[in-house]
Amino acid sequence: MTRYKKVIAQNKKALFNYFIEERLEAGIVLKGSEVQSLRQGKASIEESYAGDTGHELFLYNCHIAEYEKANKFNHATRRPRKLLLHTKEMKKIIGKIKIKGYTLVALSMYFNKKNKVKVELGLAKGKKLYDKRESIKEKDWQRDQSRLIRQK
């Protein structure tokens, strides 16, 4: 069964900089002007991550551009946004984040089938420099293989 996703923003750097061990979907609390701006595709999650404050998770450094037609009722572009998860999921993830070396990174932001904005989060562990080099070599080898197959 395929799921409908209208992708707003993706964090391709996260897949290069981190080992993604677990993925999860979370809702996000937004203001009206933020939703309108997202419908226009004006968002960036390149540097965004999730952190906990007590028993809640927030998304930090997510840039959603101001909506031009919202005038004085506009939002702050980089404000912390609350993430919506079930309590059991949240406790489990917060426990894993507290382990040294793990972080919760935003991988993509999209509209689901019901036109709700969702954020795909990844429980990630940072890659070392030699790991990054290895992944670059692997991508180059895959690219060369596909070229050789096409030439034959």
Swiss-Prot record:
Any one Pfam family match given in the protein's UniProt record, by short name: SmpB
Q: Which GO terms describe its biological process?
A: trans-translation
User: What UniProt keywords are attached to this protein's entry?
Assistant: Cytoplasm, RNA-binding
| Location of the protein in the cell | Cytoplasm
Question: Main site of residence?
Answer: cytoplasm
Q: Does the keyword RNA-binding apply?
A: yes
Q: Which CDD domains match?
A: SmpB (cd09294)
Q: Which GO terms describe its cellular component?
A: cytosol
One GO MF annotation is: RNA binding
Record PANTHER family = SSRA-BINDING PROTEIN, TMRNA-BINDING COMPONENT OF TRANS-TRANSLATION TAGGING COMPLEX
Q: Name the family the entry cites.
A: Belongs to the SmpB family.
Q: What does this protein do?
A: Required for rescue of stalled ribosomes mediated by trans-translation. Binds to transfer-messenger RNA (tmRNA), required for stable association of tmRNA with ribosomes. tmRNA and SmpB together mimic tRNA shape, replacing the anticodon stem-loop with SmpB. tmRNA is encoded by the ssrA gene; the 2 termini fold to resemble tRNA(Ala) and it encodes a 'tag peptide', a short internal open reading frame. During trans-translation Ala-aminoacylated tmRNA acts like a tRNA, entering the A-site of stalled ribosomes, displacing the stalled mRNA.
Q: What is this protein called?
A: SsrA-binding protein
